[in-house]
Design a protein with these regions (language model features):
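Flexible loop/turn segments at secondary-structure boundaries
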Residues: 7, 151, 195-197, 257-262
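Secondary-structure transition/capping motifs at alpha-helix termini
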Residues: 22-23, 160-165, 240-243, 261-262
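Trp/Phe/Arg-rich N-terminal binding region typifying the photolyase-homology
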Residues: 1-67, 235-236
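C-terminal substrate/ligand-recognition segments
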Residues: 186, 191, 215-261
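Helix-loop-helix junctions that connect adjacent transmembrane helices in secondary transporters/permeases
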Residues: 194-226
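An acidic- and aromatic-residue-enriched active-site/binding cleft used to recognize and process polar
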Residues: 3-5, 30-33, 57, 147-148, ...
């Protein structure tokens, strides 16, 4: 399995590892959500990074192409039919988005990355912030589910940019930045477990007096707040199962700073 870095998830993986070891069952775990295992990159004072720019600088300084050795093929296993029922696990069936927009599989994910780097990356640095333009890679669902790794994305980006991180194609270097941002926040989650406990990263915000309104929350979730940009974003999520990166930030800020709902 791929390791996860939230406190509960990490503890679950430890317990699972201990149980499998006790039963003499072999297993493998990987840090495949990231290029560097969380906690690997440290400041000169041997403390975890809490600011992105120095983290990115260290990330690039320590980079080795051997990190991207990703061509190992696992032997195909015989399929095991394990019946499952959502009710057994306590899950509820929710609204089904249009999944035809998301062809499954690693080949599809890699195809999307290559098409993006070839056709869209040229304008990515400016188009990425305009949700009316189809200017992003739309690779986030594949990354989130482990269908493609950030290592593979970095490798393809470097190949398309003469193996340069900070020079060359401005759109590609910006896309690499976004992948490093993703890794930075996984390091935050690993290094500062309090954020997994519903506590803010910045202590000064502990004093915020949150409010809660059930009907406002329902309106936000369904895209009926009366604010067009918010409603369009939430309806996109409901319809496509995905939301534009800029809109993710907009609806989150609206939820916390305008509605004053606890994140």
């Amino acid at each position: 399995w791929n390791n996860q870095f939230g406190e509960d998830e990490a503890n679950r993986d430890i317990k699972t590892s201990d149980l499998l070891s006790a039963l003499d069952i072999g297993f493998e775990s990987h840090h495949d959500q990231v290029v560097y295992a969380p906690g690997t990159l440290r400041t000169g004072q041997d403390s975890p990074y809490s600011v992105f720019t120095p983290f990115k600088r260290k990330w690039i300084e320590n980079f080795d192409m051997n990190f991207l050795d990703i061509d190992y093929k696992y032997e195909k296993k015989n399929a095991t039919n394990i019946k499952s029922n959502l009710d057994d696990f306590g899950f509820e069936k929710t609204h089904q988005a249009d999944m035809s927009l998301w062809q499954e599989g690693e080949k599809e994910a890699l195809k999307r990355v290559k098409i993006f780097l070839k056709d869209k990356a040229i304008n990515y640095s400016k188009d990425r912030n305009d949700p009316i333009i189809d200017g992003t890679s739309r690779i986030s669902p594949y990354l989130a589910l482990g269908i493609i790794s950030p290592k593979r994305c970095i490798l393809e980006a470097l190949k398309a940019n003469n193996f340069e991180f900070t020079s060359g194609h401005i759109g590609i270097t910006k896309w690499i930045d976004e992948i490093v941002w993703r890794e930075f926040y996984r390091n935050i989650m690993f290094s500062f477990p309090k954020v997994s406990r519903g506590m803010p990263f910045q202590d000064y915000s502990k004093s915020i007096q949150w409010r809660f309104n059930e009907s406002e929350l329902a309106a936000w979730k369904s895209g009926h707040t009366g604010f067009p940009i918010i409603d369009a974003a939430m309806r996109q999520l409901l319809h496509e199962g995905w939301m534009h990166n800029r809109l993710r930030m907009v609806v989150a800020m609206f939820f916390t700073k305008n509605m004053l709902h606890d994140w």
